[in-house]
Amino acid sequence: MVKKIIAAIFMAMACSCSHLDLKGMFMPTGEGVEKRFEQSKEMNEDLKNGYVQTQESYAFYVATDPHIDETHKNLGTFNDAFRNDKGASFGVILGDCIDVKDNLPVYLEALSYSPEKHTCDHKIFHVLGNHDLFFNGWVNFKELVGPSVYWFEAIFDGGKDLYISLDTATGSLGRTQTKWLNSFLQENRSGYRHCVILTHTNFFYTDNSQASSGNMPMEESMALMDLFARHNVALVLQGHDHYREDLTFGKVRYTILGAIHDSAAAPEYLKVNVSSDGLHLDWQLI
C-alpha cells in the first residue's frame, strides 16, 4: 500500500496540474452524495428528466468512460453511429466523461448533433462518474449537464419503460438517495413495462480500485440487488472498471461495459434493442 501511494505521488508530480487532481486521488472533492442528491432535487423536484417518444420496439445506445482529454475519436465514432440510426431513440453515457479540468464543454461538443453529418437529433442522457468530480467538477456538471439523480420515460402507444440514473460517483448511494429509490420503485414500478438502472460504479467488483471513489460496499450492493429483484428490474448498466462483464443475479441482468476512451485496449459501445420480448444486447467494437 505504501509503495502504491509513493508511486501515485510520483505520477502526480510528473503530470500537468490540469490532468491530475492530486487531492481527488486520495479523498472526494466537492459536495458529497447527500448534497448532490439534494441539489438534484432542487433542479427537478420530482427528479423527472423528461421523456422520449418512441415505438413499442426501439433501440438505445450506451457507452462509458470516455475520459476526454486531448482526443475523442472513439466517442465521435459512437456519436456518428448513434445519430445515424433511425431505429434508435436516445443515448446514454455512463460517466467518467472527462479527465482534464474544465473539459466538459469539449465532451458535450463531441456528442453534439451536426445536420451535415447526422440524420437524427437524438437526446443523450449522462451519468455522473468519479472522474467527473475531480477538480470540484460537480459545479460544472450540474450547470452544463444537470442532475446526477433522475428518471425518464420511453413512451410508446399502449405503454412506457422506466429508466433511472443513480449517483454512485463516490462509491455509495448514501442514505437519502437509497430511501428515495426504495420508495420510488415501490410506488411507481408497476406502471411500466421494463425498468432499466443506469449507474457508473458497478456492484460486483469489490476491490478499492478507483482511489477516493472506491467500489460499492458489498452490503449495499446486496441490498440493492435484492431491491432490483423484488421490483423486476430488467437491466442494470454499469461502467467504472474498464472491462466487460455480463451476468444475471436474482433474474436481473447486470452488464458492465468496457471503456470507450481513445487509449482503451478494446474500446466498445452497446446497442440495446428493446421490445415486449425483452432487451437484446448488441456489442459494437471500435
Regions of interest found by a model, annotated:
Residues 19-105:
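N-terminal active-site segment of His-dependent metallophosphoesterases
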Residues 282-286:
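Short, solvent-exposed aromatic-acidic interface loops
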Residues 60, 91, 163, 195-196:
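Hydrophobic beta-strand anchors of alpha/beta hydrolase catalytic cores
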Residues 27-48, 52, 103-194, 214, ...:
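Extended active-site neighborhood of metal-dependent phosphoesterases/phosphodiesterases
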